[in-house]
Amino acid sequence: MSLPRFMIAAPASGSGKTLITCGLLQALVDRGLRVASFKCGPDYIDPMFHSRVIGARSKNLDAYFVDTPTLRYLFGRTAEQCEVSVVEGVMGFYDGVDFTVTDASSYDVSEKLDIPVILIVNSRGASLSTLAVLKGFKDFRPNRIAGVIFNQMSQKVYDALAPEAERMGVKPLGYVPKLKDLVLESRHLGLVLPGEVEELRDKLKRLGQELERTVDIDGILEMARSASDLDYSAPAVGRIDGTVRIGLADDDAFCFTYEDNIELLERCGAEIVRFSPIHDAHLPDVDGIVLSGGYPELHGEELESNRTMLDDIRDAIASGMPCIAECGGFMYLHERMEDRDGVERRMVGAIPGRTWNTGKLCRFGYVTLRPADEGGMMGSRPVVKGHEFHYWDSESNGTDWEASKRGTTYRCINDTGTMLAGYPHLYYYSNPEVPLGFLRRCAEYRDSKD
């Protein structure tokens, strides 16, 4: 199948990938094109920026979480609905899950999906040296680097260097000058949330217009359309009998949700009912709850003041309604949560004790997980992959699942049989038996109400 596509990658983080990706997305949307966007790796925040531009939820592509056929499916089923797909890389182009491998890197994804790559080379404080960087990346190993955009470069320098890049076999596709008033600010958990960037839409609009002036958008589209055909098929997954209604927390406090997780729940028999623990007075009529990650610590007062919602969720869990809670959602289930200002807030109370800010990164990175025994929600011991990134710690991290990463094994997650709650974010397509096991519990709860 013909799926026009290209990847924006860079030698390192901080090169301007997200800024330029958002600008290109805006320019393509302004041309009236139907655009799909993707982010390599497990990051939630960059796709949220993409979504503000394209008006639809952006997706993740992670070669650590899934095998190649599944990766191709997750890409293809969205890309086929659009005229062009834009993939933003992660970290440095060749940086993988360990220091000396390219597994799960942007490079790995580009190879598995046959994507032409445009390298963003940050030229701040350099001129000719940027070509040495470009040549090094081009020659490091066989790759799909087909074009280059120079960031923080003047037109005068670009005009001098572009012919040299072309002689290397890399198409020069333009430059981005220094744009002090169009910077997307950073903070402790990556980029700020889209809703917190003042006048973001105006910024992105102006950014798209600037890139139309200095970047060869037509050349990028030509490159995207030259990508080879990509075949894919949907992986087989199980399905429960009938349908269960799943309440999905979805607001400014609980906004870290993989759209592919939601799609898989639907394939397995879920009807998704989105609700807001901040704004809605009551939990909707559902058979199960998914409390996503996010930033509950930024909304502690609002969450605490919504007593009817807190009571509804506590009572539902106590009655046996199945619940999966990850990171921020796990924090919300505690008796008490320290907010960003150090104020201790009363929360749901389904998890004993408190969660507090340690002032440092507690855990970070990919993790492989499985139940410690067969007595929990899954009724077996399926292996599932996920990732962790949190500054808050808990008095009740749980010991019901085993986690492993880089040769280290530790216990985590509270698994009561109907409640699965802990800091790790799970990626369902890494093992569809996990969401299916959750929905089976939800179906049992549904039937118990009849």
Question: At which residue positions do the language-model features occur?
Answer:
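Structural motif
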Residues: M7, V86-E88, I118, I149, ...
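A short helix->loop->beta-strand "cap" motif at the edges of active sites that frequently abuts
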Residues: I115, V170, A318-P322
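C-terminal and late-domain segments of enzyme folds
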Residues: R213, I240-G242, F254-L264, E271, ...
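Cysteine-nucleophile active-site neighborhood
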Residues: P296-D373
